Amino acid sequence: MLKMGVLLFIFLVLFPLTTLELDTDRPVERHAAIKQDLKPQERRGIRLHAPRDECCEPQWCDGACDCCS
């Protein structure tokens, strides 16, 4: 009886869990498909600068901080 219970558990619980498609994988695939269709010039324009709180050196300023403008 124990062997039958183990087999039922494996085939009714564990096997379906391993065959389920994870929903978290889909946005990554969709994002990769969208980015794949972009031209290299368009891909470079997507990068965003992180907001900065401190001021940067004037010779290294890229316009992302408030003190540079």
Curated annotation (Swiss-Prot):
GO molecular function, one term: toxin activity
Gene Ontology CC terms, in alphabetical order: extracellular region
Keyword Secreted: yes
Primary localization: secreted
Maturation propeptide residues: 21-54
Locations listed in the record: Secreted
Superkingdom, natural source: Eukaryota
Signal peptide interval: 1-20
Tissue-wise expression: Expressed by the venom duct.
TM region(s), chain numbering: none
S-S pairs: 55-67, 56-65, 61-68
The record's note on its domains: The cysteine framework is III (CC-C-C-CC). Classified in the M-1 branch, since 1 residue stands between the fourth and the fifth cysteine residues.
Family: Belongs to the conotoxin M superfamily.
Protein's UniProt name: Conotoxin Lp3.1
